[in-house]
Structure formats: structure tokens, C-alpha cells
Amino acid sequence: MVSRLEHPAGGYKKVFESCEELAEPIPAHVSGKIPAWLSGSLLRMGPGLFEIGDEPFNHLFDGQALIHKFDLKDGRVTYHRKFIRTDAYVRAMTEKRVVITELGTAAYPDPCKNIFSRFFTYFQGTEVTDNCSVNIYPIGEDFYACTETNFITKVNPDTLETIKKVDLCNYLSVNGLTAHPHIEADGTVYNIGNCFGKNMSLAYNIVKIPPLQEEKSDPLAMSKVLVQFPSSERFKPSYVHSFGMTENHFVFVETPVKINLLKFLTSWSIRGSNYMDCFESNDRMGTWFHLAAKNPGKYIDHKFRTSAFNIFHHINCFEDQGFIVVDLCTWKGHEFVYNYLYLANLRQNWEEVKKAALRAPQPEVRRYVLPLDIHREEQGKNLVSLPYTTATAVMCSDGTVWLEPEVLFSGPRQAFEFPQINYSKFNGKDYTFAYGLGLNHFVPDRICKLNVKSKETWIWQEPDAYPSEPLFVQSPDAEDEDDGVLLSIVVKPGVSQRPAFLLILKATDLTEIARAEVDVLIPLTLHGIYKP
């Protein structure tokens, strides 16, 4: 799965350029044959505006939210995109400056206000961004674009129009939710976010949003906290980007990347800082795994520990013979990977990009195994008895269980990230195949497939082509797990008059089925969904 290419021409810089929205959908030029059954919409979220006037955004996740849609019907394809009318976007465009602080970019006071107005504004507290550039998912019959704060934005998936901003704090006891919910076949949504728990200590709540009911009432109004995980540090919650779910359990990985709550509450009013200034790493903590029963929701007080790593994306988790198998995309060590995702770093020339990646945490796909039946008298013993894995779990004298992983893939500065599976059939179940975006020194330059049982790999790659997260769509008459297609938006700037396309690959071997080229450049997209 290691990249075969170098990128001295720097074409990857094009995915970090601002674009304009489209007034209406544009036709795509199709080559190859799109399967007749593939009829629906690929909806993607990402940053589309990287500066406001003369003020640049600093971090990859600061760019203003742009929703993309490829419509597929009867072998024809159209492409459309619009900026989400968030408060962050509308006010920035109106005032022609950054108005709301983003992850790595601070908003500064309006120079037209006098000193007393600015002083009053500071001590009112900073506005939390609603820049929903990370993902989109359904709640009931509605679709919401999201980031990781308490705000989500309802959008029309057909017209891409913005409908309304929703504050999750009006429904749930959370400070925000991740952009990676788990969604069951009936439409039930599960997610995780930090909150204030007992004795004003920080904690993490798993929340449940029910499916749409017959009376068509708002599912958010019936949402509830299902179970709570304690925090390892009272006032420093870990950064949480995703979580795991099996048929009967939730898996939460607590990493040493922390949010310093005191800095978070005071930094803007005192120093005009941004969110990134509030992160710090606990180099003594390592990484903790937490488990909870799903129904009824109950915390399981087993103390699983392992060496330090960053985790953004879970691949899958499943139960087998009294064990929970957890497959993750990890980054070794306690340093925060987001420190390397500033736009100034990502836009550097190829040799400089490679040098920066040498200093960054190194990626690795890992499998951990957590035993459910634990006895203190088994000290020093490996509790894992599954025959197909080398992962271990050893009982220690202090009652903790030390985990060592099985490495499923490792390549120097070669990441398997933005993982996807046949979610509708195999999420939370024993599975074989994972699909992902290959990062070459942080540059996305290939699509990958991994057999998690045999470790066999496949890749799709072209020179000067920069794909996005591949989404799996199952064939309607599928019998095998990987019977379907992968959809990915690819940017290929080069000399072509059509610098971007929707790529359709056969999921079994990553051979190309078709592509739908458009005559506009498409900036980086992060996550999305396929809507039949």
C-alpha cells in the first residue's frame, strides 16, 4: 500500500485553493460505463474558502464549509456545490474579515469599534464556530452538515440550500459532538461528546438520537444520554474525533492529546488565541481504552492501557468469543498530528513536505483486542485466546490490562486513513475488507484496500492525481462483502481542461469502471455520504 510516486511538481497544492460556488449543476463528461443500478447522490463536505479578503485562514480545518454533490442517474452525472450559509461564513463575507475564531485562526476585533466596545466583547466570551466543513449525516428525514462543536446545520440535500442552524446544547448535555456518528439500519444515531460530569469533572457522554417516529416529531427532541465515560483528567478532556460500536458495546479510546479547559475558557479574552492554542499533550499518560454496554447503557470498569498514540478514525470493532476486536488508524506518540496540518506546511514544495513528515507522528493500522472476562489472579498472563491475531492483553499487578497491538499495515510516512467499510452490512461485525485514502507524507495520492485478515493490499494511483476518502456502495444483488463500487472525488490539475472527476472503482480489485470529469477545480473534501 506504499505510494509508488513522488510529487515534485506540487500539484497537490491545488486542493488547498479557494473556489467559487456554482449557480446550478454542471454536466460531467463520462468515460467508461456507470453501473445501471448506481443512481443517487454523492454528498461531500470540505473547506472551500481559505481566505477572507486579505486575511488567510491558517489551518486545514479553518476553511469555510462547502457542500458538494455528484448526482448519478441513467449513466449521466452532474456536479453542484454551494457554501453553507453558516454564521461564520455570512458574517465573514459581510464584514470582509474573519469574524469567528476557527481551529487555527483567531478572529480579531472590528477595527471600527472603539476600545470600550472591544473590551465588552472580549468579556462576553468568544463565539463558538458553526463552520460545518467536516461531514454530513441524516437525522430522521433531515440532513445535517457538521463540525465538532455544539452547532450542526440543516441542509437540503437536493438543492444544497442552507435551512437552519441547530444548537445541540438545547437537546443534550454535551459541549459538542463528533462528526463521526454511528447510524443503525433503523436510523438510530449514536455519537459521543465531552460534558461536565460528577463534581464538575469532565466526562464523555454517549448520546442516542432515535429514528423518525410515525408522528413525524423531531428526533432531536427525543435524544438522550445513554452512558457516560469518566475522564482521566478532571479539567483536561481528551480530543475525540470518533468512537467504536459493536452490536452490544461502545468503545472509547482516550488519548494523551488534551484540551486545557482553563486555556479554552480564557485564551481569547486574554490573548486573542485560537483553538489550537488550547491543545496540549500529556507525555506520561499513554492511551486508555474504555468500554460500555450498549443496552442498557452501563460503563464497564476495566482499566485497559497501552502506549501513547493519536487516533482520529476507527475502522471497525466487533465481538468474538468474549473479546472485542478494535481496528484503528493510529499515529504513534503523544504529539498532536494537527500540529502538522497548517496550510503553510501543506502548501510547501515537495521536499519540504517530506521533511515535515519526518518529524511528525508516524501512522500505523493496528488491531487491539480487549477481553471482557477479566480476573485479577491472572497476573502476567496474556488473556487473548483468539487464534487469528497476535494482539495481546496482559493483566498487571495494579489491576490494569496492558494491550499490545497486531500491526495490520505500517509504512514509513505512508498512512492508511479516512477508512471505510461495507458499513450497512458489517459495521460492528466480523469483517474482512477496509478501504482508505493513502497519504504520502500527508499528501493524498492513492486509494487503498486492505484485507484485515490476510493483510493483502490493493491500490489505485495515477501521476499527479489526488483522491479523497473512498465511499463504498454495495451492489443491490451482492453476495460477497466487497461486491460493490468505491466513489472518490479526484483532483488532477496537470494540463487537462477537466481538472477534477468522480472516480468509480470496482471494490473487489480497485480497477476503474468509469470517471465523470468536470471543467472546474474541486478543493479538498473530508467526509461524506452516498444518498440513494
From Swiss-Prot:
Reactions accelerated catalytically: an all-trans-retinyl ester + H2O = 13-cis-retinol + a fatty acid + H(+); lutein = (3R,3'S)-zeaxanthin
Molecular function per GO: all-trans-retinyl-ester hydrolase, 11-cis retinol forming activity; beta-carotene 15,15'-dioxygenase activity; metal ion binding; retinol isomerase activity
A single GO cellular-component term on record: endoplasmic reticulum membrane
Compartment(s) where it occurs, according to its Swiss-Prot or TrEMBL record: Cytoplasm; Cell membrane
Presence of keyword Disulfide bond: no
Co-factor note (free text): Binds 1 Fe(2+) ion per subunit.
Any Pfam family the entry gives: RPE65
Tissues showing expression: Predominantly expressed in brain. Expressed at a low level in the eye.
Lipid attachment in record (S-palmitoyl cysteine): C112, C329
Membrane topology label: Lipid-anchor
EC annotation from Swiss-Prot or TrEMBL: 3.1.1.90, 5.3.3.22
One biological process term in Gene Ontology: zeaxanthin biosynthetic process
Binding site for Fe cation: H180, H241, H313, H527
Cofactor entry: Fe(2+)
Keywords: Cell membrane, Cytoplasm, Hydrolase, Iron, Isomerase, Lipoprotein, Membrane, Metal-binding, Palmitate
Post-translational modification note: Palmitoylated.
InterPro entries referenced in this protein's UniProt entry, alphabetically: Carotenoid_Oase
Protein purpose: Specifically generates 13-cis retinol, a stereoisomeric form of retinoic acid. Capable of catalyzing the isomerization of lutein to meso-zeaxanthin an eye-specific carotenoid.
Family assignment from sequence similarity: Belongs to the carotenoid oxygenase family.
Protein name from the UniProt record: All-trans-retinyl ester 13-cis isomerohydrolase
Native source species: Danio rerio
